[in-house]
């Protein structure tokens, strides 16, 4: 879930808190909260004064799925001051992703006294429940994330077939365009205005021989052989059947070979 998305925050009745303020401005304070639902364990955000700005505080250990608006709504429960600016500074993840891990944000108030009151009262209130401040609470799920990652790493058979067909189609299109481009270049003049012309090879001349010059054709035996018509008809039928079976077998082999070639074409679906 993107932490930078605007969440729909509900209005919650403010809690009254009265306290005589005696505070070390450099002290690290905490604010108690719970997620809600079946996640009722107490957690803590940490607050401290921003040394670089008189009217700013730094809030850390914020779950990325909570959102900036929820933090502001919680602080407004016990320290109702106008906020001049707020933004997420960083995350504790290795890649500094603002959608994961624990976030640190900066809050700047209009008045410096807001900083003192916020830090003085934050430990005496709560724990606040996050789901009380959200109209449509949605939290990350390990099962959901694992399922999404599994589907990304291991596509289904239909997805793999679709990717393979797309790759083969694109490859064939590129090859066709390359042949057309090469053919077009041969018909275009070069820088000097010359056109490359290729000469086709002549077909070999046929050699005519007399039947007497080739004994295997019949030069040694001119007598006609008597053929049994019944046997000859049966042999023709048998030859046709054998030829049909050979063609069918060859067709199956070619089909398998084409399928293997498609799968072997430098295809990396992942």
UniProtKB/Swiss-Prot annotation:
Coiled coil: present as a keyword of the record?
Answer: yes
* Disulphide bridges: none
Q: Which domain of life is it from?
A: Eukaryota
Coiled coil stretches, renumbered? 233-268
Cited InterPro entries: RRP7, RRP7_C
Could you tell me which species this protein originates from? Caenorhabditis elegans
Q: Which family does it belong to?
A: Belongs to the RRP7 family.
Its keywords, alphabetically, are: Coiled coil
Q: Name one Pfam family in it.
A: RRP7
Write down what this protein is called: Ribosomal RNA-processing protein 7 homolog
Which GO annotations describe the biological process of this protein?
Answer: ribosomal small subunit assembly; rRNA processing
Query: Could you give one GO CC term from the UniProt record?
Result: UTP-C complex
Signal peptide positions on this chain: none
């Amino acid at each position: 879930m993107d932490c930078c998305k605007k969440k729909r925050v509900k209005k919650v009745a403010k809690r009254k808190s009265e306290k005589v303020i005696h505070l070390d401005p450099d002290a690290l304070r905490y604010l108690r909260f719970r997620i809600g639902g079946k996640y009722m364990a107490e957690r803590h955000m940490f607050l401290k004064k921003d040394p670089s700005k008189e009217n700013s505080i730094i809030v850390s250990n914020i779950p990325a799925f909570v959102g900036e608006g929820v933090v502001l709504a919680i602080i407004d429960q016990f320290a109702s001051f106008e906020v001049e600016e707020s933004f997420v500074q960083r995350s504790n993840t290795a890649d500094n992703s603002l959608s994961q891990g624990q976030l640190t944000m900066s809050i700047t108030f209009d008045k410096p006294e807001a900083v003192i009151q916020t830090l003085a009262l934050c430990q005496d209130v709560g724990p606040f429940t996050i789901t009380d401040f959200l109209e449509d609470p949605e939290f990350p799920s390990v099962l959901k994330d694992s399922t999404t990652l599994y589907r990304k790493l291991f596509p289904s058979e239909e997805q793999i077939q679709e990717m393979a067909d797309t790759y083969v189609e694109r490859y064939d299109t590129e090859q066709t365009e390359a042949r057309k481009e090469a053919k077009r270049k041969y018909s275009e003049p070069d820088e000097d205005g010359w056109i490359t012309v290729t000469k086709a090879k002549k077909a070999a001349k046929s050699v005519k021989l007399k039947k007497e010059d080739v004994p295997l054709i019949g030069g040694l035996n001119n007598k006609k052989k008597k053929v049994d018509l019944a046997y000859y008809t049966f042999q023709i039928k048998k030859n046709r059947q054998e030829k049909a079976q050979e063609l069918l077998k060859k067709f199956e082999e070619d089909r398998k070979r084409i399928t293997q070639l498609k799968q072997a074409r430098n295809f990396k679906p992942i």
